[in-house]
Design a protein with these regions (language model features):
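A short beta-strand segment in extracellular, disulfide-stabilized domains
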Residues: 35-47
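Surface-exposed, short loops/turns at beta-strand junctions within beta-sandwich domains
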Residues: 102-108
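Beta-sandwich strand segments
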Residues: 119-133
Length: 142
């Protein structure tokens, strides 16, 4: 008597993809903002990511300010990089605080650059590696 044993393995044609988060907007509180205010900015994700490891967020603030009376100078302030593990630690909306200088002239431009280390390819065929997203708003001052 011959005994046959078969091993059935489940196979799927479904592929595993990394999904890069997408920011819908940056919210500013309080609103309206006046020079000298301490503000909190939140980059809202309308699509969460998936299969992402190391993540870093770089925030910058660009504005003009008064010096020597009426003249203005342009400057950009770069905040320290915020690092996390997106899937392992936190996929929460990125948040940063900033004190608006009392001598600001005009509006404040806020930029967030997010860098993601992908654990799989993306559906568009991008292979493992890094992807990034940039979002920017202008905060109107009163």
């Amino acid at each position: 008597m011959t005994m046959c044993c078969g091993l059935w393995m489940g196979c799927s044609n479904d592929e595993v993809y990394s999904i890069v988060p997408h920011f819908s907007k940056i919210e500013c509180q309080p609103n309206p903002v006046t020079p000298g205010d301490s503000i909190t900015l939140t980059a809202r994700q309308d699509q969460l990511g998936k299969l992402i490891n190391a993540t870093s967020y770089d925030w910058s603030f660009t504005y003009s300010y008064f010096y020597d009376g009426a003249a203005t100078k342009d400057t950009t302030v770069y905040m320290p990089t915020v690092k996390t593990n997106y899937d392992g630690i936190s996929n929460a909306d990125p948040v940063i605080g900033f004190w608006v200088p009392a001598n600001i002239a005009g509006n404040l431009t806020v930029t967030i650059n997010a860098f993601y280390s992908l654990s799989a390819q993306t559906s568009s065929g991008q292979l493992y590696g890094q992807a990034n997203r940039t979002n920017q708003i202008t905060v109107n001052l009163q």
